[in-house]
Amino acid sequence: NIERADKVCEELDINLDDVDCVICDNIFDKLNDDLYKKIDDKINQLGVEFDTFLVGSKIPKDIQERDDKLSAKFNLTVETLKKEVNRLIGLRLWEIYDKEAEFESQDIVFNIDLVESKVRIQINPLYIEGKYNKLQRGIPQTKWPCTKCKGRGCEECNFTGKQYPESVEELISEHVLKLTKGKEAKFHGAGREDIDVLMLGSGRPFVLEIKEPRLRKIDLAQVEEDVIDEAVDDIMESSN
């Protein structure tokens, strides 16, 4: 065990602190304050909000190969070096930020490159479920590119690139993108509908996917109110 090994090293006057590990090249020494400062700087740089996270890492190829060969040779079933690196980083991040590590579905993924000493944060999508009613004809469900210029912009579409000035997708997604500081929105409606039909009753279900949202905690009731207000204004304007 560890205690017996320490005693033997002491009797033989061997200082293990001065010995480089032939398997991992002391890679765990890189999990230091400098690394966690880089992570913190990246979080602050992006201004990203999260409650759950996952850690992924890149370690030198030769270390990975030695670890694999050792496990294969002695039929070891212990955790790999890379998994141990991820576990230790995740534990430290939990201590620092009081956020939970989540393996199935997480807000962000910390990708730690121990080869080039770089940190990258992958921001996972935010999904918002809802229903909508359409009380006026002539509004498409999704953004409709101009049929003449194919979305590039021309005189026919007043250089908007759109066949119709508004869509259900745009009315909803623009507000959410602004609040989440997301990169892009994708509208997933439950089925398609013709532009000249109404959507009454309990509404049509949809899921709005926000890619790379910096903020995740938004007031959905306020979003609903803002979307309705803008839609009413657009309807009133178009009817005048």
Which positions does each model-derived feature cover?
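Catalytic/RNA-binding core of pseudouridine synthases
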Residues: N1-N240
